[in-house]
Amino acid sequence: MAAYAFLLGSLWAADPDGAALYQARCAACHDNNSAEERAPKREQIAARKPEAIVGAMFDGAMIAQASGLTLDEGRAIARFITGKEFSAASDVSMGKCDAPAKKLSFAPGDWNGWSVESDNSRYQAKPGLSAADVPRLKVKWAFGFPGDSRAFAQPSVVGGRVFVGSAGGKVFSLDAATGCTYWSFKADGAVRTAITIARPKTGSRYIAYFGDLRGTAYAVDASSGALIWKVNLDKHPYARITGSPIFYEGRLLVPMASFEEASGIAPGYKCCTFRGSLASLDAETGRQLWKSYTVLDPPKAFKKNKNGGQMYGPAGAGVWSAPTIDAKRKLVYVATGDSYTDVELNTSDAILAFRIDNGSLVWVSQVTAHDNFIVACPNRSPNCPEVLGPDYDFGTSPILRTLAGGKQIIVAAQKSGVVWGLDPDQKGRVLWSTKIGAGSVQGGVEWGHSADRENTYAAVSDVSAGVDAQPGISALKLATGEKIWSTPAP
């Protein structure tokens, strides 16, 4: 271990530019780690591939900190941290399918996009296997993402094919039976969304829709991977699409989030100007039909920080997850994240309802007010809100379900560790709330939850919740929120 540390130190020392850049851009968090900042220690990052670190700087969580860096400077930082050289470019032609794919068609048991249904219940009524089958499952094939060190996009399985995005910005179409590659497509940024497969018109070709971490939406031919259209939906430098696009009646609904809250560590940054949004596009052409912001008023200068820097607001309320379709009421629901500034904002940490036809806002149900938060505030960056909020975003999509008797309910799960039941007929009035986790900046319900016809199921992270952490999974009754069972994480 000592020899390894000496060698690693020697390699770091051999790259003084990388060391200097690291000190200027990275050390404040990674050499002074705290759970609040969600920053891994430098020795943890050193175990990663340099390619992964460059990806984080230019397409991922560190995009704010890397602002203004050249690619060569980013690579120097990655070499300094890891003590490793970059690998030769991976050959994406390896593993190509020998025969062309058959004509694409949907089949029972397919999983298309973020959820099988546009209500975002994430419930497969015809899975093709039972719980008793799970212990007998064996690995048939495995696919390694070329040049990547992590996989973070949910696959879609449609017509015997697997469609999946990657941290390296490539989208792949694989044979579900063998894992061979039919095609790959290179996006401009990392692709974290699920891939949605749809026909914009009856009888037309199937199209694969997705978004990247640079705020661009794409449509490619699902059979060949050929680009049909792409459109950037937000020019803000930290805009990103993490929520999966939803196809509905010829429209593509695309949510927008950002990583601007990570810019707070930079004292000179003019914080903050991003507004979450939802865009409706013509699914055939990519033409924007409407775009509605979750922050209704444009940001304005409202005060100077302690360093004399101009601050702006309101800002925030990004939409991290897929929108939810309410076909009966002709509405689309989104769940929002926190506010970035001290300017009052009643649409953060909320469920919002927009009209599908024109994007007009119908109602707002905010469950956590005054959640003003940006990253690195334990170090008291001059951009920090006066009173730091708990960072209780909604990272999951709202779920719309029909109860026995016909009444409908919206279920939403939050990073606070609370699951909410809302009434869609009463402007999102809270029907019940049940706390299943401690909640924290990395706690509560982070991404996915689901619901069948009677219950809702939510997994709790609570990574940074300390002694109060309650990681695990819980089942609640849809009608009342009553906890039926809870199983702790292993």
Annotate each predicted stretch with a short phrase:
Residues A132-P146, V171-V191, T196-S204, Y209-A239, ...:
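Extracytoplasmic/lumenal domain signature
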Residues L8-L21, D98-P100:
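Electrostatic cytochrome c docking/interface patches
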Residues E36-R38, S118-Q124, G147-A153, F172, ...:
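Short, solvent-exposed loop/turn elements at domain surfaces
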Residues Q124-A132, R136-V157, V162-F163:
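Asp/Glu-centered strand-loop micro-motifs enriched in Gly/Pro and often flanked by an aromatic residue
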Residues G95-K140, T294-P299:
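Blade/loop signatures of beta-propeller domains
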